[in-house]
């Protein structure tokens, strides 16, 4: 009665929790939604006896106006991960291929398998997308390519020139998706600007989320911008009433709260830089790869390799829950100044304990943030 291929379907592993520990495993904001957005959510609860607008017309209209595109170019979904799944379903038949970097967003291979598509993972090169190798992996059955920028879990970005060179090698009948779940944290001036690239390439779409910077992970809301034909197809394979009323109201309010958002994001970026300064100041213990890569997201990647699980356990003993990728590394979310203080103290003990840095190494980055005073 059950599809036999589901027995080999890898399970998506969410960030774990532990009572009394600091959870830095899921790239969530540790703060509540933006104040003005919280007020709108509270007001919207009075109408929960009614179905939401199935077309999400007001939200899509607000997004279209904000982004400077037509309404027909915008889709919304139950988180950007749902939109990624709809993209696979809308573009791929059984046996068609989807190309993505690996390691990247771990849902990609799962979404492919669910849709009957074949995932083609192309290894990262020094923690970054190898766009040349990805273009070479495109074959006759390739229908879709995901470029996660900034990349999850390494935090690295592709440059505008690299991306345009890559797009020049992609066949016109292959859809490329810029997955920009962490775009609000990206300070890399050389990164492609999505709206500019959408005007250049008719086979390009951009996927974003309200889960991270906007602090709406619990409401599940994402949006897609792309060609009208693709948006129509994505909507056809979506679940009816897939975006709930609270999410729609919160999305509209979030677009209108860009000033509040900027303050919050700037604070997170400052904490990311503080963590990176600490990691740059310690002495790696004979590793072939750097301890971390420059991140443009709300997390940092610790290149622990075979010691990833040991580092994960060492951090747990210090009261910090991170996200372990066994045999590869550990991803740690960056949040507030107070939580960064806890993280840095934990890293100071955990990194030497597993032999990733020289014992007793000092770092100028290990100091309390002035924001925490």
From Swiss-Prot:
Cofactor(s), names only, from the UniProt record: pyridoxal 5'-phosphate
Annotated CDD domains: AAT_like
Catalytic reaction list: an aromatic L-alpha-amino acid + 2-oxoglutarate = an aromatic oxo-acid + L-glutamate
Location of N6-(pyridoxal phosphate)lysine modifications: 212
Keywords annotated in UniProt: Aminotransferase, Pyridoxal phosphate, Transferase
EC category name: transferase
Alphabetical list of Pfam families matching this protein: Aminotran_1_2
Alphabetized InterPro entries for the sequence: Aminotrans_II_pyridoxalP_BS, Aminotransferase_I/II_large, ArAT, HisP_aminotrans, HistidinolP_aminotransfase, PyrdxlP-dep_Trfase, PyrdxlP-dep_Trfase_major, PyrdxlP-dep_Trfase_small
The keyword Transferase appears for this protein: yes
GO annotation, biological process: L-histidine biosynthetic process
GO molecular function: aromatic-amino-acid transaminase activity; histidinol-phosphate transaminase activity; pyridoxal phosphate binding
UniProt family annotation: Belongs to the class-II pyridoxal-phosphate-dependent aminotransferase family.
Cross-referenced NCBIfam families: hisC, PRK03321.1
Primary role: Aminotransferase that catalyzes the conversion of aromatic amino acids and 2-oxoglutarate into corresponding aromatic oxo acids and L-glutamate.
UniProt name for this protein: Aromatic amino acid aminotransferase
Organism: Corynebacterium jeikeium (strain K411)
The encoding gene: pat
């Amino acid at each position: 009665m059950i599809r036999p291929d589901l027995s080999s379907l890898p399970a998506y592993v969410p960030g774990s929790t532990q009572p009394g520990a600091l959870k830095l495993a899921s790239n969530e904001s540790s703060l509540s939604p933006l104040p003005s957005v919280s007020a709108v959510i509270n007001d919207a609860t009075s109408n929960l006896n009614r179905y939401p607008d199935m077309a999400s017309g007001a939200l899509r209209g607000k997004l279209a106006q904000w982004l400077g595109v037509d309404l027909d170019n915008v889709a919304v979904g139950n988180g950007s991960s749902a939109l990624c799944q709809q993209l696979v379903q809308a573009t791929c038949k059984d046996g068609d291929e989807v190309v993505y970097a690996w390691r990247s967003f771990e849902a990609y291979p799962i979404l492919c398998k669910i849709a009957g598509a074949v995932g083609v993972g192309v290894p990262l090169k020094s923690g970054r997308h190898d766009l040349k190798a990805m273009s070479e992996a495109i074959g006759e059955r390739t229908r879709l390519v995901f470029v996660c920028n900034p990349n999850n879990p390494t935090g690295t970005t592709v440059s505008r020139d690299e991306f345009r060179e890559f797009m020049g090698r992609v066949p016109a009948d292959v859809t490329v998706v810029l997955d920009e779940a962490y775009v609000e944290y990206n300070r890399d001036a050389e990164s492609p600007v999505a709206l500019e690239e959408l005007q250049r390439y008719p086979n390009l779409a951009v996927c974003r989320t309200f889960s991270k910077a906007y602090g709406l992970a619990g409401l599940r809301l994402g949006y897609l911008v792309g060609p009208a034909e693709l948006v129509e197809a994505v909507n056809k394979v979506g679940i009816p009433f897939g975006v709930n009323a609270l999410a729609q109201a919160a999305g509209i309010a979030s677009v209108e709260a860009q000033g509040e958002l900027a303050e919050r994001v700037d604070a997170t970026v400052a904490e990311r830089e503080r963590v990176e300064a600490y990691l740059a100041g310690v002495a790696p213990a004979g590793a072939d790869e750097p301890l971390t890569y420059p991140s443009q997201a709300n997390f940092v990647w610790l290149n622990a390799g075979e010691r990833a699980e040991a580092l994960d356990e060492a951090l747990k003993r210090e009261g910090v829950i991170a996200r372990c990728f066994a045999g590869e590394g550990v991803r740690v979310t960056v949040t507030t100044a107070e939580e960064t203080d806890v993280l840095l103290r934990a890293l100071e003990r955990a990194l030497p304990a597993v032999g990733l840095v020289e014992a007793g190494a000092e770092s100028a980055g290990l100091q309390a943030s002035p924001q925490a005073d």
